Amino acid sequence: MQEYIDIVTEDNKIIGKALRSECHENPRLIHRAAHILVFNSAGQLLLQKRSMNKDIQPGKWDTSVGGHVGSGESYEKAAYRELEEELGIKNVNLDYLYDYKMRNEIESENIRSYFCKFDGRIDFNKDEIDEIRFWEIVEIKKQLGSGIFTPNFEQEFELYLNMVSHNKE
């Protein structure tokens, strides 16, 4: 099935649409993605290990949930859809965290991130994810820069830490 996603300007205005595959071949085609940081009650962050079959960053630990916003879809609707598709989680509350931009040689994304607290059973999508695990924040900090995480997750994690430390002040 061909997946269309909206193409946007730097300031997130929709200017067209393109196939997902086209967006991954052309970093000038800025598109939207939704991410969710899933925490448990102990304050541990769930990370997913990307399937070795993925075309981008296979086998690396990544944000709890992440996916493209479909053409005509809202960030929030995409976040809930991806949460259910990737982890089998539904009927939870998502809290907005922040927006940020991710740019690299492969693609350009305007990302909206959400927070979710969840302690229930997780039935992850084994076609997209090889493994899931809750991590202590200090453990993630120690591993930053070691090559086990996707560069995008490391960017996201730093943003989250900055937001949390700013809110404590």
Residue ranges and their predicted role:
Residues N26-R28, I56-K60, F134-E136:
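A short, polar/proline- and glycine-enriched secondary-structure boundary/capping micro-motif
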Residues A33-V65:
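A glycine-rich, hydrophobic loop/mini-helix early in the fold
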Residues M1-H35, S41:
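Acidic, metal-coordinating catalytic segment for phosphate/diphosphate chemistry
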Residues E22, S71, Y98, E105-E169:
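Nudix hydrolase/Nudix homology domain
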Residues A42, M52, S74-E76, E84-I122:
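Active-site segment of metal-dependent pyrophosphate-handling enzymes
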